[in-house]
């Protein structure tokens, strides 16, 4: 339940961040869309955990499929990239989301993939919010990666 609440809060934070920015090139259709990238493993060692986070994100999106910004309604669409629970493959997944032009990113389950993908989001100036990446290095030196969970030192010493 706590993880679901964290994911819901994460989605609210993303929507709030999006409200602060402007879309330079709106879609050519009448429907305005905000695309949120989901940077989660659906395969590999952390695939099961990533799938649970995806379910939480999808649930939050089903509850809040639109957001009103400046009096205009925007549809929130999700697009996915499987980082395969592998820090050597996470940069490719991050680049996929950047190339899709996402407005913000949610994820990932597993700190090593967040650390590996984070520089790509930072370079593209895309805010990313991790719900379970607890390693302090995820956000250190990256002004675009945030987290809604505690960090490893808070959990206790080894």
Regions found by a protein language model. Name each.
Residues 1-35, 66-70, 99:
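Short, low-complexity disordered leader/linker segments with a strong preference
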Residues 26, 54-80:
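Signal peptide-proximal N-terminal region
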Residues 30, 37-58, 81-87, 109-112:
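Extracytoplasmic "Venus flytrap"
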Residues 42-48, 80-83, 103-104, 143-150:
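Second-shell loop/turn segments in exported
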Residues 49-65, 89, 128, 155-158:
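Short, solvent-exposed amphipathic alpha-helices that sit
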Residues 58, 62-66, 95-103, 119-126:
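Sec-exported extracytoplasmic/periplasmic mature domains
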Residues 74-99, 155-158:
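Structural motif
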Residues 102-158:
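Extracytoplasmic ligand/sensor domains, especially the bilobed periplasmic-binding protein
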């Amino acid at each position: 339940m706590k993880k679901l609440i964290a994911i819901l809060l994460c989605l609210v934070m993303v929507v709030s961040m999006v409200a602060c920015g402007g879309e330079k090139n709106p879609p050519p259709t009448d429907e305005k869309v905000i695309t949120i990238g989901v940077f989660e493993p659906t395969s590999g060692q952390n695939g099961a955990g990533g799938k649970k986070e995806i379910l939480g994100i999808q649930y939050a999106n089903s509850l809040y499929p639109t957001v009103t910004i400046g009096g205009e309604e925007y549809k929130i669409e999700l697009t996915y990239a499987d980082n395969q629970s592998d820090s050597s493959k996470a940069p490719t997944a991050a680049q996929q989301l950047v190339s899709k032009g996402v407005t913000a990113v949610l994820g990932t389950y597993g700190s090593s993939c967040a650390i590996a993908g984070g520089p790509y989001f930072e370079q593209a100036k895309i805010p990313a919010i991790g719900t379970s990446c607890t390693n302090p290095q995820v956000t250190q030196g990256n002004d675009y990666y945030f987290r809604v969970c505690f960090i490893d030192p808070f959990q206790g010493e080894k």
